[in-house]
């Protein structure tokens, strides 16, 4: 493991994947999910604050990557659900902009719905493959994760070609 090799040479390591996407990168409001020692995490705070708004130590080395995988798993579950809810709502004549406004103040609210125009399925398959590998290594069967892994392939196509118009910005 890289951390063990680094430790043998007196080098401190954190795993620190980032979340929240391009818009957060542009505004310096990234979320940094860290794994490593509390001392190394504390020393790094001045660095994280240059590009991130929030930073969390989740545990030992590897916990940051695990947290990132769980974030992405939930994002893609939600992204697929938004495509399906949007398609069903459009098929039933709903005004998606009005429905979105209502959902954003409901228990169905999500960051993906709030920022639908920025949701991209570019990395979704890779993300879900990571989740499935983690489940396999833990000896767990996760049927929702397996289904989402397959559905993100279609989700990517739909989002690029004919996505539900949650924001009223699609010109059809």
Features from the language model and the residues they span:
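Helical "substrate-binding/catalytic lid" subdomain
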Residues: 62-172
């Amino acid at each position: 493991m890289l951390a063990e090799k680094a430790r043998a040479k007196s080098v401190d390591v954190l795993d620190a994947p980032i979340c929240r996407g391009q818009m957060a990168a542009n505004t310096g409001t990234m979320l940094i999910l860290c794994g490593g020692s509390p001392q190394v995490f504390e020393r790094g705070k001045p660095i994280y604050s240059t590009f991130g708004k929030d930073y969390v130590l989740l545990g030992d080395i590897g916990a940051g990557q695990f947290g990132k995988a769980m974030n992405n798993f939930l994002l893609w579950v939600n992204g697929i659900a938004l495509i399906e809810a949007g398609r069903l709502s459009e098929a039933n004549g709903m005004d998606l902009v009005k429905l979105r406004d209502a959902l954003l103040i409901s228990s169905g609210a999500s960051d993906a719905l709030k920022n639908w125009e920025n949701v991209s399925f570019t990395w979704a398959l890779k993300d879900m493959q990571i989740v499935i590998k983690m489940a396999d290594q833990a000896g767990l069967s996760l049927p929702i994760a397996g289904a989402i892994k397959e559905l993100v392939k279609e989700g990517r196509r739909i989002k690029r070609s004919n996505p539900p118009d949650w924001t009223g910005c699609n010109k059809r």
